[in-house]
């Protein structure tokens, strides 16, 4: 249910912003598999050396490219709802990817809004490394974006307090509030 509301809310907000002449890109992330993939298999084949780092394959998805009109991306939003698509979350690397994409843009003002339903989690990575590795990495990426760039970063946590990560953060307990809170957060930034 949260991903359905997120897809609908994002679609509506993207259409509205596009009508106002604002370029919008919609990105998503997950892992390709549960509990590791080829990276984990490779690590096991090599006798499980210590501190292996990430042990899962990333899946970064461009639902709507900033230079494409929303009508060309309409069916991509349906992909968000695909059964079995969403698995584990390696938030730090996903945020780095989104940040690299947005800083390469020509627009003067850049706002990156994160919608999160939990902390970074990847069972294979966390069970084979320091248990807070993904948390620490996310915090370091956020710090770079917030302190050393002109990108304005905001986050909305769905049933999860994201203020322990992001400076500009709000938590909602009811996913039905998402569209309203996304809109309010953007208005605050303008």
Language model features: what each stretch is:
Residues 1-190:
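Acidic, glycine-rich A-domain
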């Amino acid at each position: 249910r949260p991903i359905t509301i997120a897809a609908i809310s994002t679609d509506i907000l993207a259409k509205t912003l596009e009508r106002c002449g604002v370029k919008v890109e919609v990105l998503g992330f997950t892992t390709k598999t549960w509990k590791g993939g080829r990276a984990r298999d490779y690590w096991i084949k090599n006798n499980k050396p210590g501190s292996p780092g990430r042990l899962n394959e990333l899946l970064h998805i461009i639902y709507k490219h900033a230079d494409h009109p929303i009508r060309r991306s309409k069916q991509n939003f349906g992909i968000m709802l695909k059964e079995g698509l969403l698995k584990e979350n390696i938030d730090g690397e996903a945020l780095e990817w989104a940040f690299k994409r947005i800083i390469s843009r020509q627009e003067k003002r850049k706002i990156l809004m994160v919608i999160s339903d939990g902390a970074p989690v990847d069972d294979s990575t966390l069970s084979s490394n320091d248990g807070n590795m993904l948390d620490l990495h996310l915090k370091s990426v956020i710090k770079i974006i917030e302190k050393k760039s002109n990108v304005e970063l905001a986050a909305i946590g769905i049933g999860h307090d994201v203020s322990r990560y992001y400076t500009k953060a709000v938590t909602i307990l009811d996913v039905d509030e998402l569209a309203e809170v996304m809109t309010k957060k953007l208005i605050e930034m303008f």
